[in-house]
Amino acid sequence: MYVEHFFKLPSQTKELLQNTPYRFGFGLLSEVTFYRSYSRLKEDGTNEHWPDTVIRVTEGIFSIRKNHALNYHLPWDEEQAQIFAKEFALSMLQLRWLPPGRGLWMMGTRYMYERGSAGLYNCAAVDTSNLAHAAEWAMDMLMVGAGVGFNTAWSGKATKPDKKHPKIYVIDDSKEGWVKSVRLLIQSYTDNGPFYRFDYSKIRPAGSPLKTFGGIAPGPEPLKRLHKKIEQILDDYLDKKIDKTRCVVDLFNNIGLCVVSGNIRRSAEIAIGRPGDKTFLHLKDYEKFPERKEYGWISNNSVVIENLDDFHYIDAITSLIASNGEPGVLHLENMQKYGRFGEIVPDRAWLSNPCGEIALESYELCNLSEIFISKCSNEEDFQKLIEYATFYASTVNLLPTHRPETNEIIARNRRIGVSVSGVADAIEKFGLETIIKWLRKGYEKVRTVNERLAKEAGIPVSLKVTCVKPSGTISILAGTSPGMHYPLATYALRRIRIGKTSKLAKLLIDSGLSFEEDIYDKNSYVFAFPIHYDNPRSIKEVDIYEQMLVLTMLQREWADNMVSNTIQFDPTRYDAKDLSQIVKHFLPMIKSLTLLPEKETIYPQMPFESIKKEEFEKRVTQLPKVEWNTLSGHHADSERFCSTQSCQID
C-alpha cells in the first residue's frame, strides 16, 4: 500500500461541487470526450460525472501530500488544506486549469493507492544500452499509460539461443507477467539466457473487466503476436537481414503495437536517433522498408543535433521533412545547458518524451498540468490558476512508483511541467505584449510556489518546472486551441469513432445524435460534432515564420523544459532549401522542432473538417440533449497520447 493516510472532502464541499454549474468548452463534443476517455465506473456500476471526477482527483492529490507529510512527521494543517482543496476543486470544475489526461484517469483510484504513481505520469524515456531491461521498462510504462521515448544506443551484441531445449515460462495474469516475458525472451539473445516458450493459460480471456486499473482485458493474443515478432526481429538481425537501428526501433515499435492492438492502453513512442544514421532517417520510407508500414506509425522519429558542429546534417534532414514531416529535431546542447532561453540550468537529460515537451534522463518520468491562458480574465486570474496547477504537478512526485531505478531519478530531479494552452487564442484576444508579460511573471510564480511546496515537503526544488504540451484531448474539454497551436479552422466538424458495442454509442444514438458506419472499422460508428474556436485566425492564415516566432517566444518567456510544436508550412511556398535556412536560423534558440507540410487531402470521415459558419450554426441547432445520468456500465477508452495536430487519431 503506497498511501495509508487519506484526505477526504467534507460532505458540504462535495455537495457544492455537485450543485455548482459548469460548462464544457465545446459543448457536446467535450461531454462525449469526457465520458469516452475519463469517466470511470463507480462502485455502484454507474459512470462518473464531471463533479465526481473532480472530487476523486482532488481527494487523490491531497491524499498524496497528506500521506507524505504524516509519513515523514512533517507539519500538516488539515483546516488550511480543506480551504485550499475547495478552491482547487472549484477552479478545476470550471475547467480553468486541468491535470493531464493520466491524472484525470488515475488520480485517486485504488490502483494508485495500492501500486504507486507510475500510472499518473505522461512522459517517460529510456536509453537502450541494456536492451532487455529497456524493453521491459518501456512496456511497463506504456501499459500504465505513459508515452515513451527511446534511443538506438544498444551495442548490437547478441547471439542466437539454443531453441532445441526451451524452458517453459507460465505467464502470470498481470502487467508484471507480460513485461517479464518480454525481458526473458530478449535476454535469451542478448545475455546468453535460456530460451523460453510461453504458457498463456493463466491470462484472462478477452473482454474481461480490469477492475483495479479500469478498462477491458485484451486476452493473450496481442502478447503471443509480440513474442513471435520479437523472435523474428532478433533472428533477422543476427542473420544480417536488418541492421542494429532497425532491430531496436522495430522491437520497440512492436511493443507499442502490442499495447495498442490489445487496447490495453493508447501508446505513443518517439524514436531518437543520430542524424548521420541513414537507416534511421528512412524508417518512415515504406517503399524502402515496406514491412515497417504495419508498425512504424507507432513512433514519431527525431534526430539529435548535439551542437553547431552537427548543423551540416540539416540540409539532408529538411529534404526528408519537406516530403513527409519527419524526422523531428532535438537540440541536445540547449536541452542540457539551458532552462528558458539564455538561463543556465545544467541538466543531464539526453532523451525526450514522444511529444517533445520534456527532456528526460533514462528511466525518468515527468508529470504535467495545464492552464488555459485564453480563459483567464486578467493577470491576477492567471497567477491564481498557477497556484493550483503547480500544486498538482509538484505533488504527484511525492508518491513513489513501483520502479526503484525511476524513483532514484525522480527524487533527484523532481521535474515537472506546468503548461499553458490556448496560447494562440490568447495572443489574438489580449495581444502579444500582454501575453509576454503574463508568461514572464507567471514563470516566476511557478518557481515561487514550487520552492515553497518543496520546502514544506523536505525535498529538492524541481530542476525544471514549465513546458508547453500539445494538449489534444484535454484542450477539447476546455474548448481552446491546443498548446501553442492555431486551430486548423475557426469552424469545423470534429469526428470521433466509438465502438458499436459501447454503451456510450448506444446512449448517443438513443438520444438522436446522427451517426455513420465507420468505413475503416466495421466495429465502430462515427459521430460528428460542430465546433467553433474562439480565434479569428486559423493555421492557414499563419505563416511558418510567425509560428516559429511564437515557439521561440514561449521557449524564452515560459518553458524551461521544452515546447511541443508542430509547425505547419505550405510546401508550394517553402522547399527543402528554405526549410534548411529556417531550421538553422531558429534551432539555436529552441530545444525541439517538428515541421509538417500542409496537405489539402480530403477523404471520407476525416477527424477534422473545416466548415462554414452557416453550416456550424445549422448543425448546432440539430444537436440533441443527452441525459448523461442514464449512462452506466461504460468502460472509458482512456486517452490517446499521440495528440498533436500531426497525429491525432480518433
From Swiss-Prot:
Q: Which domain of life is it from?
A: Bacteria
Name of the protein in question:
Probable adenosylcobalamin-dependent ribonucleoside-triphosphate reductase
Report the InterPro entries cross-referenced here. RdRp_reductase_class-2, RNR-II_ins_dom, RNR_alpha_hel, RNR_lg_C
Q: Which reaction does it catalyse?
A: a 2'-deoxyribonucleoside 5'-triphosphate + [thioredoxin]-disulfide + H2O = a ribonucleoside 5'-triphosphate + [thioredoxin]-dithiol
Does Protease count among this protein's keywords? no
Give EC number(s), comma-separated: 1.17.4.2
**What is the phylogenetic placement of the source species in the record?**
Bacteria, Pseudomonadati, Campylobacterota, Epsilonproteobacteria, Nautiliales
Q: Which Cys residues form disulphide pairs?
A: C123-C366
Active-site residues from the entry = C355, E357
- Molecular functions per Gene Ontology: cobalamin binding; ribonucleoside-diphosphate reductase activity, thioredoxin disulfide as acceptor; ribonucleoside-triphosphate reductase (thioredoxin) activity
Question: What are the names of the required cofactors?
Answer: adenosylcob(III)alamin
Describe its partners and assembly state: Monomer.
Keywords tagged on the record: Cobalamin, Cobalt, Disulfide bond, DNA replication, Oxidoreductase, Redox-active center
| Record-level GO BP terms | DNA replication
The gene coding this protein = rtpR
Q: Which CDD domains match?
A: RNR_II_monomer
Q: Which Gene3D superfamilies match?
A: 3.20.70.20
Task: Determine if Oxidoreductase is one of this entry's keywords.
Answer: yes
Q: List residues traversing the bilayer.
A: none
Family that this chain belongs to: Belongs to the class II ribonucleoside-triphosphate reductase family.
Organism, scientific name: Nitratiruptor sp. (strain SB155-2)
The record's section on PANTHER family has: RIBONUCLEOSIDE-DIPHOSPHATE REDUCTASE, VITAMIN B12-DEPENDENT RIBONUCLEOTIDE REDUCTASE
